[in-house]
């Protein structure tokens, strides 16, 4: 995306940490912006984080959902920024008929074991920019240009690393991807059943989905009234034997509160970020909206292998736990 030493890149504080590490190892300076109830960067948050040095935005579509693309694209175009999408957690999600990951200059998807389609490891990079494609193709394989049939005689237009996915992982990923439409259909049915049975609990809602028709339904994202209520519910889940959820607020990998090593930029060797002035002190960040949203969020991963009876049993346990923790009774 053209990001180099000292370029500022707007990133979310709620994402898998690799999204931010990529900026650092490209020589850029991460600048954290606020998310909103979509669980993704907000247009307002992006706008407030822009400086004359801002080069790009890394937009992460979290928890199976999508960002409000119309509003974000307006800001990106207005300020002539490069949009990079991370749809690792939202493969198969769409916004007004277009797959997330296809709005920016580049996009990526994950085949990690936790995703809707898995190859065990690896992922996919997409772009409509030919120059960007050729650069990525070479960069991912020690700079090889892959021209001709003799690997030993290939040219190296750029320096690169080894980010190759193996043939075995790629074959598994291709096979699994063909199953995604079926998985998505089943997941959406499970999620709707869970939402119907939980929507009557006073004070409990769901994360905002800008385009419900495009939801990948890989997660059920519950929003509690506040952080204290969420903590009580999580504690009650433990007592009731409810599992399969993430309370991201204390998650070591997905929320900035636990990223002490990143805040201190701990690395094996000096990085460009050590030598350039940063617009934010990562240890003194003020992101009240993000803290409020993630503090209230509890997400359940949805599995297409569940039987309807299992969905109902789990949902009943969730409902009972929330009612007990919050001292409320669901509406009929």
Descriptions of predicted regions:
Residues 11-12, 29-38:
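Short beta-strand->loop structural element characteristic of the AMP-binding/adenylate-forming
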Residues 90-96, 103-219:
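Active-site region of PLP-dependent enzymes
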């Amino acid at each position: 995306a053209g990001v180099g030493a000292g370029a500022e890149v707007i990133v979310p504080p709620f994402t898998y940490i690799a999204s931010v590490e990529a900026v650092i190892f490209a020589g850029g300076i991460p600048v954290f912006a606020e998310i909103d109830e979509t669980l993704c960067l907000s247009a307002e948050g992006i706008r407030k984080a822009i400086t004359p040095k801002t080069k790009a935005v890394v937009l992460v579509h979290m928890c199976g959902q999508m960002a409000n693309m119309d509003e974000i694209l307006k800001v990106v175009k207005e300020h002539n920024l490069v949009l990079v999408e991370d749809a690792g957690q939202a493969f198969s999600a769409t916004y007004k008929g277009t797959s997330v990951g296809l709005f920016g200059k580049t996009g990526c998807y994950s085949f990690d074991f936790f995703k809707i389609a898995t190859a065990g490891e690896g992922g996919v990079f997409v772009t409509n920019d030919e120059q960007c494609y050729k650069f990525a193709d070479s960069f991912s394989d020690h700079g090889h240009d892959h021209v001709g049939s003799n690997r030993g005689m290939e040219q190296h237009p750029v320096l690169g690393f080894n980010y190759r996915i193996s043939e075995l992982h790629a074959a598994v990923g291709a096979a699994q991807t063909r199953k995604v439409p079926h998985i998505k259909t089943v997941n959406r049915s499970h999620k709707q059943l869970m939402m119907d049975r939980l929507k009557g609990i006073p004070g409990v809602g769901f994360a905002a989905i800008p385009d419900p028709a495009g939801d990948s339904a890989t997660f059920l994202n519950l929003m509690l009234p506040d952080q204290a209520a969420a903590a009580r519910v999580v504690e009650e889940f433990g007592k009731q034997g409810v599992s399969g959820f993430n309370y991201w607020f204390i998650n070591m990998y997905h929320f900035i509160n636990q990223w002490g090593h990143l805040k201190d930029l701990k690395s094996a060797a000096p990085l460009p970020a050590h030598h350039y002035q940063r617009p934010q002190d990562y240890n003194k960040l003020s992101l009240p909206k993000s803290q409020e949203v993630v503090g209230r969020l509890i997400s359940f991963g949805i599995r297409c292998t569940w039987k309807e009876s299992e969905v109902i049993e789990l949902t009943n346990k969730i409902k009972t736990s929330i009612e007990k923790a919050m001292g409320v009774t669901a509406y009929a």
